[in-house]
Amino acid sequence: MRIVAQRVTRASVTIDGKVKSEIGLGMLILLGIEEADTQEDVEWLCQKLTKLRIFDDGNDSMNLDINQVGGSFLVVSQFTLHALTKKGNRPSFIRAARPEQAIPLYEMFLKRLAEISGREVQSGEFGAMMAVELINDGPVTIIMDSKRRE
């Protein structure tokens, strides 16, 4: 699993002109699921995201986690995070998990993130064309990969 976590002051997902989900202060998570991903990847990322200290402590230091600032999560599935661009100019998404594998892991990720963090978890709609809006705070953007444990 690969994620892009962005610290936001607000974020929203709009589908077919209607706002589906929105949050205030928190993290927008773009989540890419690959064929080799398992429940272990879900657990590792959810634990890491919950404890990730990327929020300002008032002294210009990132010392606070999402619980300490009362933030929320907005999770959006994004298979393009597993694009391969080595050959040619058209990205290949061969490593991205097929929907029959990805959807259960996506739903598990949403559930476990809420359980582990105790925070509100909003989401986009798996497979839908979405307009994602955000105000990136900082900007702070973190890329994590569960296979590399970084």
Regions found by a protein language model. Name each.
Residues 58-73, 122-134:
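Glycine/charge-rich, flexible interdomain linkers and switch-proximal surface loops
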Residues 6, 32, 77, 133, ...:
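Short beta-strand segments
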